[in-house]
């Protein structure tokens, strides 16, 4: 959910965003579109590599490496195989503020949706992860996150209007309106 809000993240990071619409769930189609976008970024912005946030998905890592090799681009995966709890704690220690925008695992209920995650929450999530078997950093899709603020942002993202959708097992926090909070810094 909330993929359209990456535009605000791009804006506050002062990094250009290149997007495409994909009407398929086929990973082969995704890879073709990704390669096209990387080629465009290479040409338009003179990039020489891709930094991705993959932590444990071998498929994701191999896919990025293959596309980048074909496009003569470097790949960097600084979070690769990082310990989940260490990763979550490092985000908070580095002043990242993020919320959960979807949950779809036992142990994660609607109270997590839209919640700004704290150190206490990471401790609780770690316990729930052990009990219910989900990945603490949500690498398996058990939850999705959205960064509302971090040291690289010029302005935090303010959520003005949202709605929670819950079906009894999984849910989404749909951000209906958001803006850059230019008064916050």
Regions found by a protein language model. Name each.
Residues 1-185:
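Nucleotide-activated chemistry modules centered on ATP-dependent adenylation/adenylyltransferase
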């Amino acid at each position: 959910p909330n993929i359209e809000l990456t535009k605000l993240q791009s804006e506050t990071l002062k990094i250009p965003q290149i997007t495409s619409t994909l009407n398929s769930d086929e990973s082969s189609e995704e890879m073709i579109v990704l390669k096209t976008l990387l080629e465009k970024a290479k040409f338009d912005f003179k990039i020489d590599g891709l930094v991705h946030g993959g932590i444990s998905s071998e498929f994701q890592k191999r896919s990025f490496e293959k596309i980048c090799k074909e496009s003569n681009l470097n790949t960097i995966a600084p979070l690769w195989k990082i310990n989940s709890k260490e990763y979550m704690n490092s985000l908070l220690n580095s002043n990242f503020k993020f919320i959960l925008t979807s949950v779809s695992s036992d142990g994660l209920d609607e109270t997590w949706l839209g919640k700004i995650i704290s150190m206490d929450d990471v401790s609780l999530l770690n316990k729930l992860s052990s009990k219910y078997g989900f990945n603490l950093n949500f690498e398996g899709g058990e939850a999705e996150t959205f960064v509302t603020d971090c040291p690289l942002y010029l302005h935090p993202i303010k959520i003005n209007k949202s709605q929670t959708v819950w079906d009894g097992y999984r849910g989404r926090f749909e951000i209906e309106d958001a803006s850059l909070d230019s008064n916050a810094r």
